């Protein structure tokens, strides 16, 4: 078919058709029937226009080739075959100069004699069927429709055929010749049938008996039969319907649906202001672990015992000093709180038997840090409803923050591999059914790709901290309990390892409602010098507490060890979700599964093994200012997991709003990329609802920045 097209049609038409297909992401070498159809349609449009001019008296005349036509105006403006943006510019210009209503879809021609747009159709089916489809789609009085078939039939709006008999005969003869040429090469049948490419499997089935009766009973009101309903659905064009419904609602509502073009969307406006700060409940890439390998001490597995053993592995403690104060806090209290923790751990070690839990003495620095007695007294509303000046607290508007580079670094780090495994392969019984075998295989491949990922470490750390904090909040409501921040993993050699990140001290926790807040002070070890990115640590008071000797390629190096201290808070509902962070593994596995399913349905066999074992193939991971980033399937697994984990770590109303609203714009852009000619109304309102979520949250700002990169590259 491709050879036939290149021989049969003018090279200029072939070139235009190739350009059009490439603009829509289609390949002329693969979709050869479509290639032929586009060339045929373009040739008919050009033949429709050929030799037709308007003379100085405004009359339509035909000028044969060779006759002088230099001073005459072309009767038809050809819109078909132009670049999409140029075509809309031409249409807009015609509408502005002639006053003709703007069409919703790009027409093929404009007739300066009759002052109307023309939609040309070339069909391999019945002309009246194709005419109805076109009319249903366009739903416009302004656009005139003219349909030709390969059998010599034609149909036009109000039987007004625009051109003289001879011009139309020339087009019909050319179409008949194309058909004969195709038939002689054995191409016609395939070409004729390919126009019904929209038919679905069920249309080929004859629905009879009970199923037919059920189908007829299930129809919406006002439809007499299944065929009747199908015809309506096939011809349904939602944009015009929505416009009509809106105009019925109120005279004030005037939602003109505008075509959404490549030039329509603008980037999201990110807020200006000081850089955003770290707001996760625990340190991520900056965390430092004190660890013990192959723990076998007495009481192994009891958090306090494990913590004491980990603390004993470090010998570089020194007198703590404040290196980065908290702007608004009483920093000396944070310093004293750490000293108290050290002293009380020393007391534990001095005891003959280590207690299972440790409640801190309620010293004034700890009371201050945990907000003890800071909450205003609650008074029953009935006791104060007569107070004349009763009002809600004045609360400040949130301060706008700008995107800072640290959050992208955090995300990149979360996608990386560590040298430890954070997931135990849970034992599930023998597979019984074939589908179970496929599911197990997928789970095992996926687990192998993500078990060493840093995002998986964050999951296990989050699950541990939230579980311990919720337990303590319920079991010791009035106590300032000391909770070690612990995780467990396996080394490359398979040895068990217990890690200590730092400590949490829980405040009073009489949590009646899901949203009641428990305050806690977190104290976390780190080797990151806070003075490198002070804006990231706005909420922290940071102490220097020791020197750690590290082995490097050039020998041993001493690095200062810091303690990141801050007051924080959480609620029962947040801790409940934190305990269920393992769900992130399931979510990302399901996303990978849908990719495997898509590949398998194309190849008509299960592609799990090939999908994971073909190391040479790369997959799209995400957008960056450089373009579409690609990587191995393992990198895709880890990136999807990291996104899911960050959605959990940085969960907020801003993220909820941004995700819901930006998804609408994303779907519109996807529709444009899929050549579905989307229309929109109140696009400004959609942008407003997205941008009102861009305030100060680092993860939301990063997602907005990624969204802008996507817009740039998706609409090239």
Curated annotation (Swiss-Prot):
Its EC number is 3.1.-.-. Mn(2+) 2 binds at residues 80, 108. A motif (Nuclear localization signal 2 (NLS2)) lies at residues 184-247. Keywords: Cap snatching, Endonuclease, Eukaryotic host gene expression shutoff by virus, Eukaryotic host transcription shutoff by virus, Host cytoplasm, Host gene expression shutoff by virus, Host nucleus, Host-virus interaction, Hydrolase, Inhibition of host RNA polymerase II by virus, Manganese, Metal-binding, Nuclease, Phosphoprotein. GO terms for biological process: cap snatching; DNA-templated transcription; symbiont-mediated suppression of host gene expression; symbiont-mediated suppression of host mRNA transcription via inhibition of RNA polymerase II activity; viral RNA genome replication; viral translational frameshifting. A motif (Nuclear localization signal 1 (NLS1)) lies at residues 124-139. One of its GO terms (cellular component) is host cell cytoplasm. InterPro entries: INFV_PA (IPR037534), PA/PA-X (IPR001009), PA/PA-X_sf (IPR038372). Phosphorylated on serines and threonines by host kinases, including human casein kinase II. Signal peptide: none annotated. Mn(2+) 1 binds at residues 41, 108, 119-120. Its cofactor is Mn(2+). Binds 2 manganese ions per subunit. Belongs to the influenza viruses PA family. Plays an essential role in viral RNA transcription and replication by forming the heterotrimeric polymerase complex together with PB1 and PB2 subunits. The complex transcribes viral mRNAs by using a unique mechanism called cap-snatching. It consists in the hijacking and cleavage of host capped pre-mRNAs. These short capped RNAs are then used as primers for viral mRNAs. The PB2 subunit is responsible for the binding of the 5' cap of cellular pre-mRNAs which are subsequently cleaved after 10-13 nucleotides by the PA subunit that carries the endonuclease activity. Influenza RNA polymerase is composed of three subunits: PB1, PB2 and PA. Interacts (via C-terminus) with PB1 (via N-terminus). This is Polymerase acidic protein. It comes from Influenza A virus (strain A/Swine/Wisconsin/1/1961 H1N1). The lineage of its organism: Viruses, Riboviria, Orthornavirae, Negarnaviricota, Polyploviricotina.
